[in-house]
């Protein structure tokens, strides 16, 4: 969407009162510079959903609500997988009921339902980033919980987790800070036990 021509005449396009009067239909959640809008959201959701949809159907502007439903299911799957692996790693004596309650609580207590209630570009990028964060943490936990003799599986989970965390930067860059959680997950095996060192 092109910015309204009236915005170019404003001395300060970020002055709320002046902008509402001159260009009431202008977008707010974007950067405006030299007569153009710039979106600071990541490009990954567009590359994963919008572009393939347009290439297959020729229809532009896939509504964010459709891919967000798929992302919500991927989020819930990642929550259950992450909780299962976390319980296996740190609470091996926990019952299956406790594990199930923790997973249901984590999925229900997330902002997932709010994001689905208001499917827009902003919420789309947040949900996509959250999905990749949880999938990364889940895969790293799977790698940490897999016996070292199964090197192929360990490498697969480490690689998939790292790819997911890299994709987070293309959704909501500030969510990459969750990568620090790799330390408590991977530290015991790769630092304490010195598995990164060559012999």
Label each PLM-derived region with a short phrase.
Residues 106-135:
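Membrane-interface micro-motifs in multi-pass membrane enzymes
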Residues 177-199:
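Perimembrane helix-loop-helix junctions
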Residues 63-92, 135-139:
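Transmembrane-helix motifs of polytopic, lipid-linked glycan transferases
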Residues 127-151, 157-165, 179-182:
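Specific aromatic-rich, kink-prone transmembrane helix
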Residues 79-111, 131, 147-157:
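Transmembrane-helix signature of polytopic, membrane-embedded enzymes
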Residues 1-41, 56, 83, 106-107, ...:
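Interfacial juxtamembrane loops and adjacent helix segments
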Residues 25-70, 88-93, 115-119:
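Juxtamembrane segments of multi-pass membrane glycosylation machinery
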